[in-house]
């Protein structure tokens, strides 16, 4: 009489382990890129928050306002998030009037200088994303950006 086989053979288990290894070889780098892209998006959110400050400063004809002074209620030119630090830079150019032209104001985002410095992806740590503000108030990625193109959020990528 023939006995029934119960369980898995060693070969079957080794094949399953090999398949899981192959899947992990593709999934882990893709997951790391996903994490870096999501952390890079925080910088653009910080820049959006600085739009109001830039608009207020433009009433005085400049991009940067006075430095932060909590005693007088001045909020300053920086905003710090979990993964990035965003800072207003640049010089206002009043001669630009077309909605798609840069107005001279920039927001420089430095990754790895946020409140969770040790928890940021190594793929974007120390990288900068420089956003040029257009006359219409929107941002595009500008010169001085050393963040890899695949991590720059689509909302600020220059359309090619």
Curated annotation (Swiss-Prot):
Membrane topology, from the record = Single-pass membrane protein
For this entry, list what GO says about its biological process.
Answer: cell adhesion
Tell me any Pfam family this protein matches: Pilin
The protein depicted here goes by the name Fimbrial protein
Give UniProt keywords alphabetically.
Fimbrium, Membrane, Methylation, Transmembrane, Transmembrane helix
- Membrane among the record's keywords? yes
What the record says about family reads: Belongs to the N-Me-Phe pilin family.
Query: Which residues are recorded as modified (N-methylphenylalanine)?
Result: 8
In terms of InterPro entries, this protein maps to: N_methyl_site, Pilin, Pilin-like
How is the quaternary structure described? The pili are polar flexible filaments of about 5.4 nanometers diameter and 2.5 micrometers average length; they consist of only a single polypeptide chain arranged in a helical configuration of five subunits per turn in the assembled pilus.
Q: Which residues cross the membrane?
A: 8-28
| Annotated localization | Fimbrium; Membrane
**Where is this protein chiefly located?**
other
Q: What organism is listed for this UniProt entry?
A: Dichelobacter nodosus
Q: Which SUPFAM superfamilies match?
A: Pili subunits (SSF54523)
């Amino acid at each position: 009489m023939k006995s029934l086989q119960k369980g898995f053979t060693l070969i079957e288990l080794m094949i399953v382990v090999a398949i899981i290894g192959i899947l992990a070889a593709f999934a882990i780098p893709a997951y790391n890129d996903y994490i870096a892209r999501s952390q890079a998006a925080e910088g653009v959110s910080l820049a959006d928050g600085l739009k109001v400050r830039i608009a207020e400063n433009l009433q005085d004809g400049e991009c940067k306002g006075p430095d932060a002074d909590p005693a007088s209620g001045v909020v300053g030119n920086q905003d710090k998030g979990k993964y990035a630090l965003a800072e207003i830079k640049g010089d206002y150019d009043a001669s630009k009037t077309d909605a798609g032209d840069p107005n001279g104001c920039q927001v420089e985002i430095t990754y790895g200088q946020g409140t969770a410095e040790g928890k940021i992806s190594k793929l974007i740590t120390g990288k900068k994303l420089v956003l040029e503000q257009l006359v219409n108030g929107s941002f595009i990625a500008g010169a001085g950006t050393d963040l890899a193109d695949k991590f720059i959020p689509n909302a600020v990528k220059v359309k090619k």
